[in-house]
Amino acid sequence: MVIKKPANKVDKKSTFKSSNKKKNPFKSSFLTKNKDLIYRILFTLLALIIIRLGVYITVPGVTLDKRFATDSSRIQFFQLLSTLGGGSIGRFSILALGVSPYITASIIVQLLSTDVIPVLTRWSKSGERGRKKLDKLTKIIMIPFALMQAEATIFTLSSQGLIIPGWDNTNAIANSAFYYILIPLVMLGGSFFMLWIADQITIKGIGNGISIVIFIGIIISMPSNLKSTFEYWVSNSGEEANIFFSGLLNFMIYISVFLLVILSVVIMNEAERKIPIQQTGSGLTDSSEHTPYLPLKLNNAGVIPVIFASAIISTPITISQIIEAVNPDSGFVIFTRDYLSFNTWWGISIFGILIVLFTFLYSQVQINPEKIAENFQKSGTFIPGIKPGKDTTKYLTGIINRLSVVGSVFLAIIALLPYVISKLTQLPSNLAIGGTGLIICISVAIQTVQQLKGRIIQQNFIEKKKEKFTNNINKNKTSHIW
């Protein structure tokens, strides 16, 4: 009898707890469990809304010509700037430069950090503190590139009559200091603001901020590109039925190939080589399903080689745009037009070669075979049939190089596809299938989804740990209550 009384008390407590659970049905819901994740998603959406609002603020002191939106999209320099800048060049916005100058500066800093300048190499290996120093240096180097791109934009648009100095077609500020000095400074400020927003997304939001900013700019432009493609194939085909249906068929083929290209990019992004590994003393496993492995992606470098190649090839084109406004017959302008323009086979080929080179270089940066081999030795891990140490390094280097060959060629084909199609069919390159923008969009989308999944799994793991800990405490209380 003495023992039963405490048991009744326990039953009352458990009944009380269970009744509480019924009264609070949202206690274990997704929203309450993942408050941090929901906050990050909402913060990212808010940041992107702010950027999209900024796109509609035109640079002060100019009037846009009616032909601006259509004609500016056909200029190669603006196509590259639009891809890397977040797509706001089409409105000559204060955010027109986007994060393009920062990307160009970061390429230079990364290249100089690879044992070229000892101080930068030391910073790159000194953890978070060194990374912050490199980031500050990148932002300083970004300033001249941003001003140069802004000047090139103004010179190019002015020479073609796409922007008119002054408000309401008044020529009050033409050739003045405001036009050639203050407007570039406004665009520089816009670029820094966009970079700050991108940094905030990285810290408080979801995904890599710079990638997300570029991604949203490209995605926003896709519906208008599809509309323009429909008009190119169907609306402008004339009133004759056979020509109309022929144009409609061409558009349907275009959409089908577009979807196939998206599917192929997704497959190539997810494809990986699984290298079986063993732990010293663990013994052999019975089936291949339970064998631990080292995953090496077919495209280890991701979208970075395409972005880097675009930034590199856009730099001489930027300088050329400024020189052309002053001296159209300059040798440098002619060289750029003949050998770096995507309207020529030379320009297309050089762009492809740059993508291949950057894929090989960045694959070695992303996956360091020496570091992996060293970590394997420390943890007692080895690849069956391969000796630890130098042999493992050599083996991994060979596999990474072979994967890079396939990955780099694939990236180059997809990135060059719109320019090749444009060259062969006269379809405007900004409307053609594939391209840098498509690769960036798919890669960023996949990475962001993976990060979301990772955060959800991490949060669920923490919740289970908390629940297990609480249950253990309750059990201890119950066992000692009498």
From Swiss-Prot:
GO CC terms: plasma membrane
Look up the domain of life of the source. Bacteria
Q: Where is this region: Disordered?
A: 1-22
Q: Which UniProt keywords apply?
A: Cell membrane, Membrane, Protein transport, Translocation, Transmembrane, Transmembrane helix, Transport
Q: Tell me the protein's name.
A: Protein translocase subunit SecY
Instruction: Please give the start and end residues of each transmembrane region.
Output: 41-61, 92-112, 137-157, 177-197, 201-221, 243-263, 303-323, 342-362, 405-425, 426-446
Q: Name one Pfam family in it.
A: SecY
Query: Taking the first listed entry, what is the main subcellular location of this protein, grouped into a coarse class?
Result: membrane
What species was this sequence derived from? Mycoplasma capricolum subsp. capricolum (strain California kid / ATCC 27343 / NCTC 10154)
Q: What is this protein for, i.e. what is its function?
A: The central subunit of the protein translocation channel SecYEG. Consists of two halves formed by TMs 1-5 and 6-10. These two domains form a lateral gate at the front which open onto the bilayer between TMs 2 and 7, and are clamped together by SecE at the back. The channel is closed by both a pore ring composed of hydrophobic SecY resides and a short helix (helix 2A) on the extracellular side of the membrane which forms a plug. The plug probably moves laterally to allow the channel to open. The ring and the pore may move independently.
Q: How does it assemble?
A: Component of the Sec protein translocase complex. Heterotrimer consisting of SecY, SecE and SecG subunits. The heterotrimers can form oligomers, although 1 heterotrimer is thought to be able to translocate proteins. Interacts with the ribosome. Interacts with SecDF, and other proteins may be involved. Interacts with SecA.
Its subcellular locations are: Cell membrane
Tell me one GO biological process term. protein targeting
Q: How does it sit in the membrane?
A: Multi-pass membrane protein
